[in-house]
């Protein structure tokens, strides 16, 4: 239920994190205030910044810097971990290889997924079977990113406990069969900026990433502090800039949470246009449901106050696989 929002709220989630695993968290005034803010943000914009998340700013920067160093390597070096179907669509994509709604995106990226072993999810998971392809250069890459994924997973789980309360359920609503064994996706993305050719500004890229919604439950975006590029569309169709706020994550709602909330929470369209001269790095962590979970509106949201519309059931793994199989060219 998006609105004509003109800015994106900043939420201090430290009171929620302090009590996130307390059986009585729903009775804590500090938690309830955060829950109220989460509910408002998810209902009105589908986007919000979080501060007080516990990640040192030095770690956020290190993750971006290591990613940037990889993208500065030669194509031949980067292609050593080239994405292939045999790797479960994990690895490096060159500029223009990712497709959004049929149009090449002007970014390069490394795609990582929770690793899927043979027959882990039966036929449902065949496409995603494989291990992540981590660069050997920089040498710290694999250890740093695996630690970062673990921290992001824990943070997202705790935010989802607050969102569960906001939806009128128990804090455990998105654990167990829904997201007790969550799948995850991480994209490390580089967006070239504007170059100067013959004294005239020429865009190497038009749309760094075309307008889209995210697939899962909750997204955590760690973006460069000095480049405005992310834009979010409000109900009137206006594109609202989501400028970097140092030390924060940008969070947004995915398609699966929209279904769980029966449309109360919006998986809002967003895009990236880098009109800056600087190369932009973003590291995006996607917290998902269990891979084989059948997602349908929560019992508390099957009858909507403003009508009887109900979102249809979707199996997350099918939803993800369908997107992955149409997102790339020349693979």
From Swiss-Prot:
Fe cation binds at residues 212, 214, 270. The keyword RNA-binding does not apply. Gene3D superfamilies: B-lactam Antibiotic, Isopenicillin N Synthase, Chain. Keywords: Cytoplasm, Dioxygenase, Iron, Metal-binding, Oxidoreductase. One of its GO terms (cellular component) is cytosol. It is found in: Cytoplasm, Cytosol. It catalyses: L-homoarginine + 2-oxoglutarate + O2 = 6-hydroxy-L-homoarginine + succinate + CO2. This is Homoarginine-6-hydroxylase 2-ODD-C23. It comes from Glycine max (Soybean). The gene is 2ODDC23.
């Amino acid at each position: 239920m998006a609105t004509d929002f003109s800015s994106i709220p900043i939420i201090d989630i430290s009171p929620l994190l302090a009590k996130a695993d307390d059986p009585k968290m729903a009775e804590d005034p500090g938690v309830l205030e955060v829950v109220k803010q989460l509910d408002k943000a998810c209902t009105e914009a589908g986007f919000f910044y979080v501060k007080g998340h516990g990640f040192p700013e030095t770690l956020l920067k290190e993750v971006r810097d290591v990613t940037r160093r990889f993208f500065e390597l030669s194509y031949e070096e980067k292609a050593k971990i080239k994405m292939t179907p045999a790797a479960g669509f994990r690895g490096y994509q060159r500029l223009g290889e990712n497709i959004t709604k049929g149009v090449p995106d002007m970014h390069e990226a490394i795609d990582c997924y929770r690793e899927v072993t043979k027959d882990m999810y039966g036929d449902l998971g065949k496409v995603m079977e494989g291990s992540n392809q981590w660069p050997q250069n920089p040498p710290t890459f694999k250890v740093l990113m695996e630690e970062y994924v673990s921290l992001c997973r824990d943070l997202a789980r705790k935010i989802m406990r607050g969102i569960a309360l906001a939806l009128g359920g128990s804090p455990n609503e998105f654990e167990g069969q829904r997201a007790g064994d969550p799948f995850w996706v991480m994209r490390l993305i580089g967006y070239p900026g504007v170059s100067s050719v013959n004294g005239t500004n020429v865009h190497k890229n038009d749309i760094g990433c075309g307008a889209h919604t995210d697939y899962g439950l909750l997204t955590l975006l760690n973006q460069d502090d000095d480049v405005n590029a992310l834009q979010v569309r409000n109900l009137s169709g206006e594109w609202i800039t989501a400028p970097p706020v140092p030390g924060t994550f940008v969070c947004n709602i995915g398609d699966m949470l929209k279904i769980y909330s029966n449309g109360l929470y919006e998986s809002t369209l967003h895009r990236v246009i880098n009109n800056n001269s600087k190369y932009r790095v973003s590291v995006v962590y996607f917290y998902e449901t269990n891979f084989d979970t059948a997602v349908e509106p929560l019992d508390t949201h099957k009858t909507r106050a403003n009508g009887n519309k109900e979102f249809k059931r979707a199996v997350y793994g099918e939803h993800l696989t369908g997107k992955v199989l149409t997102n790339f060219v020349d693979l």
